[in-house]
Amino acid sequence: MAKITKEAALLYHSQGKPGKIEVVPTKPYSTQTDLSLAYSPGVAEPCLEIEKNPQDAYKYTAKGNLVAVISNGTAVLGLGDIGALSGKPVMEGKGLLFKIYAGIDVFDIEVNEKDPDKFIEAVKAIAPTFGGINLEDIKACLLYTSDAADE
C-alpha cells in the first residue's frame, strides 16, 4: 500500500468540489413539464398513493436504494471520540464505498448527541426516509445502555 501523506489526504478531500459524495437527479428536469411533475403539482399524486399505501414509497421515491450512514463520532477508528462533525469525512467515505461497490445511494448524517436515548430517538425519527440505516463509529456502550435500543 502506498504511504499516504497528510498533504495528499487533505488535497484529495478538498480538490474540485469538496467532499466525496453528491446528489444528482434521476428524472428529466429540462422542461417546465418535467419540473411540474418533479415538484408541484405533479408530486401530489405519488404523495397521495404513499398515504394510502406506505409501501409505495419504495415505488415512487429513492427510499429503496437509500441508506443513512449515521454517526456521532464517538468511536472513529484510529481517532477515538472526535465529535460528530469531525467524523463527517469518514461517513462520506463510507458513502462512497456503498455507491461504487453496491450502487447504493447514501446520506451521511452526523448527530451531535452523546446521550444514548436522545441519539436513538433522533435516528428513529428520521428512519422513515431510508431503506437502511448504517450506524457507524459510535461508542458501543452508548447503544447498549439505552432502553430505546430494545424497541
Locate predicted features:
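Metallocofactor- and cofactor-centric catalytic cores in central/energy metabolism, strongly enriched
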Residues: 2-143
